[in-house]
Amino acid sequence: MEFLPNQANQRSKSKKLPLRLILVVPFVLQIFAAVGLTGYLSLRNGQRAVNELATRLSGEVSSRINQHLDNYLKTARHLAQINGDAIDLGLLETQDQQKMAHYFWKQMRLYDIGYISFGTLTNEFTGAGYYLDPNKIVVSYASPKKQGNRDFYAYETDSYGNRTKLFDIFKNYQFEKEPWYAQTTKAGKSIWSSVYQWEITPFPLAVSANRPVYDKNNNLIGVIGIDQRLTQIRDFLRQVKVSLSGKSFILESNGLLIASSSQEEPFKIIEGKPKRLLATDSSDKLIQSTAKYLQHNFGNFNKIKDAQNLEFRENGERQFVQVTPWRDEWGLDWLVVVVVPESDFMAQINANTRTTIMLCFGALVLA
């Protein structure tokens, strides 16, 4: 079959692409590539910024908590040493319980502590501090020699520290079984007690800085104990803002909670008695998942010897963690943990990324 010249010419023209299309398509593809690359780089840089910000924030919060622990717990050690030295030098007479209690009362007014105790080998006890009311200082005594029993008598005080009315009696007070006394006499040196709970509601957790006291012949006289209630540490953690939903908590190397920034107490009441709480059993999901991650990652909490910056995923979301050991010369060995969810920062990053992409698309439309 033969084609007429003009028919072939028309077919040839139909195969050619329009010049406008040839010019526009590469340009559009370049803009799409630029938009995609810009969005990717924006998101990537945003995530890098989140990493840096989360690390810096958790580091700053950890530093503040460590500094608070240094100052707060150093006070108890310092005071235990001062009182022990005063007894050694004969400046504080252990036989005059009322005078000793008044001296302790004055120290309570000066220092941020919970309770001051002195127990002797002959079961005499003298103390001053916060008892049932966290805002009122009481003085307390137990003296089998004078009273004929081991009952603990607690008195309210006036504004000068003089005892006023008797308001509580704790029957058969055996302080020698409590950690602050028993562990110190066994160690024979200045130590922190293990964390223990007072037997009165609301069952506050406490840790005590203790110093044994000896006579000139190196015979044990008794033990000076300075209680620090862990509620004061808890209150500090709640005041320190981590992030929108970030948390901070402190635990022992055995996994038991010391305090946290959540509203949860570090113990549960079971059949009327307090039972301390493992961080892995916390009702706060972020604290629980972080503690479980640390336990799984290290095998045991006591294997964490240095500060660590870590991250894990919970429900598909990254969680940034900083864990820092805190120790002192009297034997405390705690872990300070700060956890920051990625979502606390990504909302603004994602908004910025969306804005960048929209601007690029706007430029595409105008082009």
Which residues does each PLM region occupy?
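A short, aliphatic-rich beta-strand micro-motif
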Residues: 207-211
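Extracytoplasmic/periplasmic sensory segments of membrane signal-transduction proteins
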Residues: 74-189, 237-240
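Short, hydrophobic beta-strand elements of compact beta-sandwich sensory domains
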Residues: 222-229, 321-348
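Juxtamembrane membrane-water interface segments immediately C-terminal to a transmembrane helix
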Residues: 41-78, 84, 91-98, 347, ...
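Membrane-interface helix-start motif
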Residues: 17, 233-238, 341-363
